[in-house]
Amino acid sequence: MPAEAEVQEIRPAAAPASRARVLVIANQKGGVGKTTTAINLGTALAAVGEKVLLIDSDPQGNASTGLGVARAKRKTTLYDVLMGEKPATEAVVATDLPGLFLIPADPDLSGVELELGNQSRRSFKLRDALEQIRREGDFTYVLIDCPPSLNLLTVNAMTAADAVLVPLQCEFFALEGLTQLMRTVELVRGSLNPALEIQGVVLTMYDKRNSLSEQVASDVRGPFGETVYDTVIPRNVRVSEAPSFGKPVLVYDLKCAGSQAYLKLAREVVVRERQRRKAAASKQEV
């Protein structure tokens, strides 16, 4: 059975369409599994029945490449959208996986900050561009993969998002990177997007043989409590190999520990989102 078909078999009946939940996958520290999480969480959410749009906001375009979308296929990219040359709906391309779609990146994204200069609402370009997709599309999740730095692309992503999902590598300086990100979130809340939430923190590259991983997990769960997902993403060679083949790990090796962890994370994200919506609806009724 082809790997794509094997992943598709996981899918239950899709839930009724509703306004998309926009999550920015962000961490200002590099090498934490940010793009890997964006690719594989997006794939896993699609595998469990959600309709997902992944936006590659990193000029390196690793999320686009990791989903097997070659540069030659990127006719319209996020760059065209942010510059106002094309609507976001024209930039959406289907991947090989049912339920997973992509707005690809372009190296020209690295010049967006200079090109937009002092334009009004330059921090709202992505938010404005996504409004039609959020209002009329039937996506249940929009995931935005950001560059590992605080620049106009990251600010646009946070301004457009409902919440931030933070991948956190189980290493010594993990909390330092998380603290920096929380400061950025507070800055964005204060001036651009007061409703921005923390969706959750996911521990990545966890090695149960290493006492440091357990210590970092404990140190993060202490102050952040239930914000930290129960699911941890293990350090797994198959997860590392998959991008070089232009495939999410769930397609590359569905049965490996990394794939199973991302499926578990996707289910946890969906359950938490249902609980959040139920709580929000209850507040409105009061």
State each model region's role.
Residues 1-286:
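P-loop NTP-binding core
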